[in-house]
Design a protein with these regions (language model features):
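N-terminal periplasmic "start-of-domain" segments of outer-membrane beta-barrel proteins
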Residues: 24, 46-79, 104-109, 163
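Surface-exposed, low-complexity loop segments enriched in small/polar and acidic residues
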Residues: 108, 207, 211-222, 254-288, ...
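Extracytoplasmic beta-strand/coil segments of soluble accessory domains associated
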Residues: 27-28, 36, 40, 53, ...
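A beta-strand signature from Gram-negative outer-membrane beta-barrel systems
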Residues: 115, 124-166, 208
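Outer-membrane beta-barrel proteins
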Residues: 156-158, 171, 184-192, 296-303, ...
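Transmembrane beta-barrel strands of outer-membrane/channel proteins
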Residues: 165-171, 182-184, 197-203, 309-315, ...
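Short strand-turn segments of transmembrane beta-barrel domains in outer membranes
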Residues: 133, 151, 160-187, 197, ...
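Non-catalytic regulatory/gating segments with a bias toward low-complexity or hydrophobic composition
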Residues: 76, 88, 132-133, 152-154, ...
Length: 629
């Protein structure tokens, strides 16, 4: 499928000036400023160039690629965010990428360095952030990532401390649902140490269909009181009932509150069914409880070495209502409780023993570490992660109607009695459990391989190993299905950035800055074979405030191990609209993995243009074109 997207985005940005002057040029740690004021006031004086030595903001990304957006402390405060998660959500229009498969999380950096994962810093308060930088996809290559996501760099303040407790309660205007959240966060940041601990407790009540006035009949003839359907010629319930009603009666609601209804009472409900709505026994939102603890510790061992550790645990419980147990019986004409004189069908729901439901409990434990070390002009980063996700799900199946059906057929059980079905028991529930474990270790080496008059040749080498383990077991109707999948992924990639011309050297003073980049990598999957990835890009900056970029990327992707082997779950009584028949139905929906899935190949073409006009303050214009195959 070919998808072409053309977008022109107006972005408001805030610059951090080095000096209160108009034209600023940054190369490495040198800022060159043309003194226009001298030229204006003294035309006979030869123009002079003032060289001001300055340092980059500590923690900024060392790249010549201009950021898409920068936020200072005032900009961050204006977002009204309470965590870094809120900030990422607020800058999503600038941070999301149109490349690749879309929908992925931007790459997150902290002080210009890789982290083990977003959870390492997501609970930091926004007040601890000095600046936020958003970079285009090309910068991802510098850190060993694919160029299909943009990069967000959070720059921390050198010294910060806080202890915050937050309570939130949310209720919709129409009621019926409430969500409570309690969170406490401790943060300590110094020049060489960072500590953050966050504890969060969330509770939410269930929201049923009836609380939103939804009718969930699903085209069913089942009803709490019961409905009668005919089995005779032309679907007739009873010729005698036809005579009383004056028409052919094919369906009739059971008179409510009557233990021995007669034909005259059924005539009052002729060709009218009892209400089959069971919205009070079906949830739109489940009842949920969640406890999460997240902690991070980081320390700089000297100016060139940083170690970070993170641990996270989350417990989540859900309870969903899936409707009422129900079935259809054949009520024989010979039954002493039947007034019809011939066989009919009785269809009804039962409030006892209780609604069908699904209970789910999930335990998630994650830990990660990051080691950053400078080796001369090179930066070596090692990240490691382990995640364990254990889930247990129990789904109530329908009730066991065997004894009840036998009693109705034998004529010993009154199907219209108030206590009909009071002693029902559920069939054995469906059980599903899964244990998903992921381990990964990745090493990245990035630095300057060669210094040229036009600029530095940058190389990035990345190697990684990932092991995924999925074990699942499903028990349904007495049949047990076990799935055990393993996947090892050894991957390597290299990226090179080569400056062709420099603005202050040779031809570059006339035609501007030109640079090219390229990357190639492969992954060897134990259960899927070898997958390749590649990319190349061209960058042209004819002026300091105008940049054009063109790039092509391609890769091969395998289905996730969960997509192949997740346990199958059957969810009963899911309201579904049949477009062919034009009616709503209750159906059983099966979800889970499919071991027959095949791989995917993708190719992207990307064109970008960025312009920051000098005559409009805090204004940027970005043009992007994507073509995805």
């Amino acid at each position: 499928m070919n998808i072409s997207r053309l977008s022109a985005i107006l972005l408001a940005s805030t610059a951090v000036p080095v000096m209160a002057m108009d034209d600023v040029q940054s190369t490495g740690s040198t800022v060159a400023i043309a003194n226009d004021a001298i030229e204006d006031t003294a035309q006979d004086t030869p123009s002079r160039e003032i060289i001001v030595t300055a340092e980059r903001i500590r923690g900024s990304v060392d790249t010549d690629v201009p950021p898409v957006e920068q936020l200072n402390e005032a900009d961050i405060a204006s977002l009204g965010a309470s965590s870094l998660t809120d900030i990422v959500a607020a800058v999503a229009p600038q941070a999301n990428s149109g490349r690749g498969r879309g929908g992925g999380m931007p790459i997150i950096l902290l002080n210009g360095q890789r982290v083990s994962g977003f959870r390492e810093l997501r609970d930091l308060p926004p007040e601890a952030i000095r600046q936020v930088q958003i970079f285009p996809e090309e910068v991802a290559l510098k850190y060993g990532f694919r160029p299909d996501q943009r990069v967000i760099n959070f720059i921390l303040k050198d010294n910060f401390g806080s202890f915050a407790t937050e309570f939130e309660r949310a209720e919709p205007q129409d009621g019926g649902f409430a969500r409570n959240e309690f969170e406490t966060t401790l943060t300590r940041i110094s020049k060489n140490t960072r500590f953050n601990l966050d504890i969060k407790l969330e509770q939410s009540t269930a929201l049923t269909e009836s609380e939103r006035d939804l009718i969930s009949s699903g085209g069913s003839v089942l009803a709490r009181g019961g409905n009668i359907s005919g089995l005779g010629v032309n679907g007739t319930i009873s010729p005698a009932l036809n005579a009383l009603a004056g028409s052919n009666v094919t369906k009739a609601g059971v008179p409510l509150g009557v233990s021995s209804p007669n034909l005259a009472q059924f005539a009052s409900t002729a060709n009218r069914l009892n209400d089959s709505n069971i919205g009070d026994a079906r949830t739109l939102l489940p009842r949920t409880e969640r406890l999460e603890v997240n902690g991070t510790w980081s320390k700089a061992f000297g100016p060139q070495t940083i170690l970070s550790l993170n641990a996270n645990y989350a417990l989540t419980g859900n309870e969903s209502l899936l409707g009422l147990p129900g079935t259809s019986f054949v009520l024989p004409g010979s039954s002493p409780f039947s007034p019809f004189g011939q066989d009919v069908t009785l269809s009804r729901y039962f409030d006892t023993p209780r609604p069908l439901k699904r209970d789910s409990e999930t335990h998630v434990f994650q830990t990660g570490s990051t080691f950053n070390h400078a080796l001369g002009g090179w930066r070596w980063t090692v990240t490691g992660n382990y995640a364990r996700n254990a889930n247990d799900t129990q789904t109530t199946r329908n009730a066991d109607f065997t004894a009840l059906r036998a009693g109705v057929l034998a004529g010993t059980t009154n199907p219209f009695a108030a206590d009909f079905g009071a002693n029902l028991l559920f069939l054995a529930p469906d059980l599903a459990s899964s244990l998903n474990q992921n381990m990964d270790l990745r090493s990245t080496l990035a630095g300057t391989a060669l210094k040229l008059p036009t600029g530095d040749v940058q190389l990035t080498f990345a190697s990684g190993f990932t092991r995924q383990m999925l074990d699942s077991e499903t028990w349904r109707s007495g049949v047990t299905t076990d799935i055990s999948l393993r996947r090892n992924n050894m991957n390597h990639s290299v990226n090179a950035e080569l400056p062709l011309t420099g603005r202050d050297f040779g031809l570059g003073a006339v035609i501007g800055e030109w640079s090219v980049n390229g990357n190639i990598g492969y992954s060897d999957l134990s259960d899927f074979g070898t997958l390749m990835e590649y990319g190349a890009g061209l960058r042209w900056a004819p002026a300091r405030n105008l940049t054009f970029q063109a790039s092509i990327t391609g890769d091969e992707n395998a289905p996730g191990i969960g997509q192949l082997g997740n346990p199958n779950l059957v969810t009963p009584n899911v309201a579904t609209y049949d477009f062919t028949r034009g009616e709503s139905l209750f159906i059983n929906v099966i979800t889970g993995g499919n071991p027959a899935l095949i791989g995917e190949k993708r190719r992207d073409l990307i064109l970008n243009a960025n312009w920051n006009p000098d005559f409009i303050k805090d204004f940027a214009l970005q043009f992007s074109y994507f073509k995805n195959n």
